[in-house]
């Protein structure tokens, strides 16, 4: 459902923020 999609996007965002080193 929609919640699943939002959760997936949120997870992707967290991965990008947590996995991308700030230089």
Swiss-Prot record:
What's this protein's family per the entry?
Belongs to the gastrin/cholecystokinin family.
Tissue specificity annotation = Expressed by the skin glands.
Biological-process GO terms, alphabetical: defense response
Does Nucleotide-binding show up as a keyword for this record? Answer: no
Q: What does this protein do?
A: Antimicrobial peptide.
Q: Which organism is it from?
A: Xenopus boumbaensis (Mawa clawed frog)
- The name this protein goes by in its record: Caerulein precursor fragment BM2
Q: Does the keyword Flavoprotein apply?
A: no
Compartment annotation: Secreted
Q: Name one cellular component (GO) term.
A: extracellular region
Domain of life of the native organism: Eukaryota
* Keywords (A to Z) from UniProt: Amphibian defense peptide, Antimicrobial, Secreted
